[in-house]
Regions:
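Sequence-level detector for compositionally biased, low-complexity segments
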Residues: 2-213
C-alpha cells in the first residue's frame, strides 16, 4: 500500500523563505505566467520562455501542415536528434527529460497530443457513459493555435525540468534540518481556518441550498 503524502515543514526561517520563492516560480510556470508574475524576480507576465539558445524551435522544414489530409496521427521522439515529431512536422531542441515528463504517471506530451490528433476516440471502460456526440465536433486539420500551445508547453516543461535539481537540494536540506511537528502547528493554531474563510451562518428567512422535505 502506498503511504499517504507527507510534506515536511521546515522550522528554519531562511529555508522556509527559499521554499516560498521556489513555490512561487512553480505556480508561475503551472499557470503559464498568470499567477505570481514578478518581472524583477525573473517571472514576467505571459507564457514562460527558455533562453533563446535552448528554447524549442520549429525550422521551416518542420512546420506542421494544416492540410486535412496531413492531420497528425502520431507523436514520436528521436533521442539522438532530440526531435519531437508531430505527424510530418517536428520540433527541435526537445530534451529527453521534457519528452519523458510525467504527471500522475501519465506522459504529459502524449496526453496533450491525444486531445488534438486525428483520431481522438477513447474506449468506453466499464459502466462509463458513452462519449457525447459533442466530442465529434472538432477541427479536421491541425490548427495554428495547437502549434502555439505546443511551444508554450515545451517551454514550461523545460523550465520545470531545470528546477528539479534545486527542488531536490532544497528538500534534502529541509529534511536534514529542524521540522515543525503537528503538535507545534496545533499549539500555534496554524491549522485553524480563519473566520473569513468559514461558511456564513444562515440567517432567518434565508433558504438553504438543499431544501428539506
Amino acid at each position: 500500500m502506498q503511504p499517504g503524502l507527507r510534506i515536511p515543514l521546515t522550522a528554519d526561517p531562511q529555508l522556509f523563505r527559499e521554499a516560498v520563492q521556489l513555490g512561487r516560480r512553480v505556480i508561475w510556470l503551472h499557470t503559464y505566467g498568470e499567477r505570481f508574475s514578478t518581472p524583477k524576480e525573473g517571472r514576467p507576465k505571459g507564457p514562460p520562455r527558455l533562453p533563446k539558445d535552448s528554447a524549442p524551435r520549429i525550422p521551416a522544414k518542420g512546420v506542421i501542415s494544416d492540410s486535412p489530409d496531413a492531420m497528425p496521427e502520431t507523436i514520436t521522439y528521436d533521442l539522438a536528434q532530440q526531435r519531437l515529431s508531430i505527424g510530418d512536422g517536428y520540433v527541435e531542441r526537445v530534451p529527453p527529460a521534457v519528452w519523458n515528463y510525467e504527471v500522475s504517471g501519465k506522459q504529459v506530451l502524449r496526453q496533450w497530443f491525444s486531445y488534438r490528433q486525428k483520431d481522438r476516440e477513447r474506449p468506453v471502460m466499464g459502466d462509463r457513459r458513452p462519449p457525447s456526440k459533442l466530442e465529434e465536433v472538432q477541427a479536421n486539420h491541425w490548427l495554428a493555435e495547437y502549434t502555439t500551445d505546443l511551444i508554450d508547453l515545451l517551454n514550461v516543461l523545460g523550465l520545470l525540468v531545470e528546477l528539479e535539481p534545486q527542488q531536490a537540494d532544497l528538500l534534502q536540506r529541509v529534511c536534514a534540518g529542524p521540522l515543525l511537528s503537528i503538535t507545534e502547528l496545533n499549539e500555534a493554531h496554524a491549522l485553524e481556518l480563519p473566520a473569513a474563510s468559514l461558511p456564513k451562518k444562515q440567517g432567518k428567512g434565508e433558504q438553504s441550498l438543499f431544501a428539506e422535505d
